Amino acid sequence: MLYQTENQHGGDVYGGGITLDFSANTNPLGTPPGVLEAVRRGLPQLHRYPDPYCRRLVQAIATHEQVPASYILCGNGAADLIYTYCAALRPRTAVELAPTFVEYGAGLAQVGCRVERYFLHQAQNFDLDEGFLPFLEEKKPEVAFLCNPNNPTGRLIPLPLLEQILQYCAAQGARLFLDECFLDLTEDGVSAKSLLAAHPELLILKAFTKSYGMAGIRLGYCLCADSALLRRMASASQPWNVSSLAQSAGVA
C-alpha cells in the first residue's frame, strides 16, 4: 500500500462502510449556492496558474475579518498552515492540550520538536483553566498550541484567560498558535483577533472548511501581526498552494 500510516481523521467516505460520521463537523446546510456558482464560473480559467499571492481573496478576508491585509496568509486548508507554521519556526519545545487536534503534534514531530501535553479532565468538563499558566511557567515552551473551541471537546476558552496566556508569551518571548476553525459554529465564542495588533506573538488559524461546508476545496488562512513570521511561512510553503477554484470559492 502506498500510504504507510492510517488516516487519523474522519470524513473518508470513499472507502465505504461509513453510515454516520460525527468527526467531520462541517456545516450541515452544505456548501452555499454562491460558492458553487463561483467555482463553476472559474472552470474556464483552469489553464492559468492561480494567483500566487491570493490578492482578491486576501482583500475579501481583510474586509470580512476587519483586519489589515498584511495580517493575512492563505493556505491549502488549515492543516497546510499548521505544517507551514512548524516548518517556518522549527521550535524545539511546545505545549498542547490533551485531547486536541492531532495535526499540531504531527506538524511539530516533523521538525523534531519536543511536545509537552496539558491534560484536560472530564471532572472539569474538559475546560481549560488557570492551571495552564503554572504549567507554562514550568515547561517554558517556545510555542503553545490551543484550539478554541477545543477539538474534540467543543469547550471554549474564555478571552480573559487567553489574554493572560498572551501576557505570559509576551514576557517570555514565546508564541501562541490559536486555532479558531470551529469558532463560527459556536453561539458564545469570541475571537481573539482584537488582540492581534498588541500581540504579534499571536497567530490565529481560520478555515472555510467548517463554517461554509467546503472541506473538499481545501482553503484556510491565518491572521498575525508579525509580518516577518508570515514571510517565513510563505517561504516555507509550496508555490501556487491555493488553487484558482479555491480562491474563487473563498471570495464568494
Predicted regions and their residues:
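PLP-dependent aminotransferase-like
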Residues: 1, 87-146
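N-terminal "arm"/small-domain region of PLP-dependent enzymes with the aminotransferase-like
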Residues: 1-48, 140, 174
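Short glycine-rich anion-binding loops that position phosphate/pyrophosphate groups of nucleotides
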Residues: 25-28, 78-79, 148-152, 183, ...
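PLP-dependent aminotransferase class I/II
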Residues: 31-32, 201-252
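Phosphate-binding glycine-rich loop
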Residues: 54-94
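Active-site pre-lysine segment of PLP-dependent enzymes
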Residues: 126-140, 152-211
